[in-house]
């Protein structure tokens, strides 16, 4: 049977207090120099590398489920239909691709709500910084958006350290298999 982790009152409050004009997720933006990536950058390669790393982070494969009759805070359960394609996206900056355009697109992406039927995170590869192609050694921005109900500052930093590495030859993380059994809330 699947282990259920109930949200604390504090974490649940981030869900309850969220509105359409006040999303309560946290975002980080990483700027990467793709000329330092062994073998170069491609979006499909980045997505494939993320797929390996996300297999080691169960939090990124869990979604919320309401408690029986919705009498208590929601619980985290394995998303049995988890699909990385729903979470990792690619977008190009309009010319000239400077700080103003990057800030505008990041602000827009940050204003969009997360789909509560899925794990509460998204990642966006933002290509075209300074009008350069990241496949040809240009810079790349990566915006990661995670709901505050799922992470706090320390947890977010730990997750980012699992997703990213500064060692190009670092071994892949050990996968954590999906929970066995069926979702007891179904």
Predicted regions and their residues:
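Non-catalytic N-terminal regions of enzymes
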Residues: 1-186
């Amino acid at each position: 049977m699947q282990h259920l982790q109930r949200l604390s009152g504090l974490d649940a409050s981030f869900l309850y207090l969220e509105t359409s004009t006040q999303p309560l997720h946290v975002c980080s933006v990483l700027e990467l120099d793709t000329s330092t990536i062994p073998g170069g950058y491609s979006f499909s390669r980045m997505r494939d590398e993320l797929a390996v790393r996300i297999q080691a982070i169960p939090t990124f494969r869990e979604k919320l489920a309401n408690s029986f009759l919705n009498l208590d805070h929601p619980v985290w359960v394995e998303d049995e239909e988890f699909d990385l394609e729903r979470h990792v996206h690619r977008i190009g900056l309009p010319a000239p691709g400077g700080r103003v355009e990057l800030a505008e697109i990041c602000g827009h992406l940050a204003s969009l709500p997360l789909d509560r039927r899925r794990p509460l995170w998204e990642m966006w590869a933002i290509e075209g910084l300074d009008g350069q192609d990241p496949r040809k050694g240009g810079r790349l921005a990566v915006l990661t958006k995670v709901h505050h109900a799922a992470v706090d500052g320390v947890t977010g930093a730990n997750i980012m350290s699992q997703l990213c590495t500064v060692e190009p030859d670092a071994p892949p993380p050990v996968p954590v298999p999906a929970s066995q059994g069926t979702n007891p809330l179904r």
